[in-house]
From Swiss-Prot:
Protein name: tRNA uridine 5-carboxymethylaminomethyl modification enzyme MnmG
PROSITE patterns tied to this protein: GIDA_1
Pfam families linked to this entry: GIDA, GIDA_C_1st, SAM_GIDA_C
Subcellular location as annotated: Cytoplasm
Species this protein is from: Lachnoclostridium phytofermentans (strain ATCC 700394 / DSM 18823 / ISDg) (Clostridium phytofermentans)
Function as written in the Swiss-Prot or TrEMBL entry: NAD-binding protein involved in the addition of a carboxymethylaminomethyl (cmnm) group at the wobble position (U34) of certain tRNAs, forming tRNA-cmnm(5)s(2)U34.
Length: 627
């Protein structure tokens, strides 16, 4: 007999980074939500790298925060080292990255989850998605019970039929020996959902007491910490930071790998899943880049109160005996004691082209999904999708239109658009190069781009919204003041400019023109700016960027206007592309499969040509005229 449990508005399956953001969003928007997980002890687990952020990923975390998500706040509480990457480059690619105390990160996120109204946490494995007439009605769990619900959000991570592999050893288990979920895939297949088999990997963990750090280069965090969350001030989160360390592989390391490559499951055929192109294992690096005589290896602490060190850059699935030799061949690791073996992990995920841009399945009403289940990789990509899936699930229950961020609004928009529009046969990783409008999608202005939307959704408080309005007012007023502040070509001014290493003046100018000079900073011009009032650092940053990159920003804004024209041409959901004359057969098939919401999205589909788009535009105009 089936045990009928309490009914919920929303069931979230999985309590990783995607699941937590999805569940918190739904609960905070007033919907009775339950989050089901195979292990309550591992909420927001970081099973691989011990960091949040990095190139493009830092952008995602700040966007999550700007919309009202939790990841940025949580890493600000639990970081052990913070660094702004790419500072020698332009602001478009500046990316914040923080080492996390993994255990603290889990604990703090669990505190938030357990203290959120409308949110219940329950340990159990979901084995079946229940539907009626292609509409979600509930989920069945391993214990035999059923949770009736209106919406389900699947955030299963790498746990579906997960198999961990190193050398000839393999076992069906999730990361770090956690239980895998071995029943849900069959339920999804019965619903007609197309599944993929992907693979990822992780390096060994080594006891820090066995490492000779004197042979390595110490890597410090930044003295001036930048928070991930816009609600935090730098001074509020400052703390003593822990160093990371840099070493390198060598020819001996590479010889050990080459001599044993036949024992790697990647090359023996024991691994069937497709791995991430941009996060290769060390054996992949050695095989694919034979001309490189060394590869970087970063030694990263996993927390304040553990001896485990993460060996970044050396993920592997080689046998245990080879791992010992390989790691011990690296300078500083000659006496390394492995406390956890490196391994690869295979798992089931979906073809994300079955999803709408709202992250709801096209074929099943009320079924949403987010995270690595959607074919992406990374904690940050997962959290971003989980947040958007949660927001749109809540809006569906409210009878509201979904929130779909486009490619000119956010990296989150680029991420989701790529997943649902472009075919991917490997784990998708976010990169700055994927964003066409990255100069206006900087991490420093995520709040100005997205906090209004978060406020309209209901995830941003009135106080936080007012803080944004005040910040924007200060930016505008300071820019106007600098534009109107005249500087004469006096002897004193010329001496100051000479001292700053910049060209002296021939005639008078404004402070704004001086700020525009690449070699000058706002701070350096203080001796020429007697009327300057103290301003928050975040305001000064915006003022400087707006002046220095004004021409480039305007050019990109013009490109966005052109982009918006095609995005604004909406396509009816029920359009059958088979009826569109003159469309090529491949285009008809791809368009019917993906069901793009706009002509802009249609133009980005692989196999749809510019000529097909012209045909489609003519057809849509004919439909419009008939109406």
């Amino acid at each position: 007999m089936t045990n009928l449990y309490e009914a919920y508005d929303v069931v979230v399956v999985g309590a990783g980074h995607a699941g937590c953001e999805a569940a918190l969003a739904c609960a905070r928007l007033g919907f009775n939500t339950i989050m089901l997980t195979v292990s309550m002890d591992n909420i927001a687990l970081m099973p691989c790298n011990p960091n949040i952020g990095g190139t493009s990923k830092g952008h995602l975390v700040r966007e999550i925060d700007a919309l009202g998500g939790e990841m940025g706040k949580n890493i600000d509480k639990t970081y052990i080292q913070s660094k702004m990457l790419n500072q020698s480059k332009g602001p478009a690619v500046h990316s914040l990255r923080a080492q996390a105390d993994k255990m603290d990160y889990c604990r703090e996120m669990r505190k938030v989850v357990e203290n959120t109204d409308n949110l219940t946490l329950r340990q159990d494995e979901v084995i079946d998605i229940l539907t009626e007439n292609n509409e979600v009605t509930g989920v069945k769990v391993y214990s035999g019970g059923v949770y009736p619900c209106k919406v389900v959000i699947l955030c299963t991570g790498v746990y579906l039929n997960a198999r961990c592999i190193y050398g000839e050893t393999s076992h069906y288990t999730g990361p770090n020996g956690l239980p895998s979920a071995n029943h849900l895939t069959e339920s999804l297949k019965k619903l007609g959902i197309e599944m993929y088999r992907f693979k990822t990997g992780t390096p060994a963990r080594i006891d820090k007491r066995s490492i000779d750090f004197s042979k390595m280069e110490e890597q410090f965090g930044d003295e001036k910490v930048v928070p991930f969350s816009f609600i935090n001030n730098p001074e509020d989160i400052e703390k003593e930071q822990i160093s990371c360390w840099l070493t390198y592989t060598n020819e001996n390391t590479h010889d050990i790998i080459r001599d044993n490559i036949h024992r790697s499951p990647l090359y023996s055929g024991n691994i069937k899943g497709t791995g991430p192109r941009y996060c290769p294992s060390i054996e992949d690096k050695v095989v694919k880049f034979p001309d490189k005589d060394r590869h970087q290896v970063f030694i990263e602490p996993e927390g304040n109160y553990t001896n485990e060190m993460y060996i970044s850059g050396m993920s592997s699935s080689l046998p245990e005996d080879v791992q010992f030799k390989m790691y011990r061949s690296v300078s500083g690791l000659e006496n390394a004691k492995i406390v956890r073996n490196a391994y690869a992990i295979e798992y089931d995920c979906i073809n994300p082209m079955q999803l709408k841009s709202s992250l709801e399945f096209m074929s099943i009403n009320g079924l949403f999904s987010g995270g690595q289940f959607n074919g992406s990789s990374g904690y940050e990509e997962a959290a971003a999708q989980g947040l958007m899936a949660g927001i749109n699930a809540a809006r569906k229950l409210s009878g509201k239109e979904p929130i779909v961020l486009d490619r000119s609004q956010a990296y989150i928009g680029v991420l989701i658009d790529d997943l649902v529009t472009k075919e991917t046969h490997e784990p998708y990783r976010m990169m700055t190069s994927r964003a066409e409008y990255r100069l206006i999608l900087r991490q420093d202005n995520a709040d100005q781009r997205l906090t209004r939307i978060g406020h309209e959704i209901g995830l941003i408080s009135e106080d936080r919204y007012e803080h944004l309005i005040d910040k924007e007012r200060m930016i505008k007023e300071e820019m106007m003041r600098l534009e109107n502040s005249l500087i004469g070509a006096s002897k004193e001014v010329q001496e100051i400019l000479e001292g700053l290493g910049t060209t002296t003046l021939k005639t008078g100018t404004t402070l704004a023109e001086l700020v525009r000079r690449p070699e000058l900073t706002y701070a350096a011009l203080a001796p020429l700016d007697k009327n300057r009032e103290p301003l928050p650092e975040e305001v000064i940053t915006q003022v400087e960027i707006n002046f220095k990159y004004d021409g480039y920003i305007k050019r990109q804004e013009h490109q966005v206007e052109q982009f918006k024209k095609l995005e604004g041409k909406k396509i009816p959901e029920d359009l059958d592309y088979s009826d569109v004359p003159s469309l090529r057969i491949e285009a008809k098939q791809k368009l019917n499969q993906i069901k793009p919401s706009s002509v802009g999205q249609a133009s980005r589909i692989s196999g749809v040509s510019p000529a097909d788009i012209s045909v489609l535009l003519v057809y849509l105009e004919q439909i419009r005229r008939k109406k």
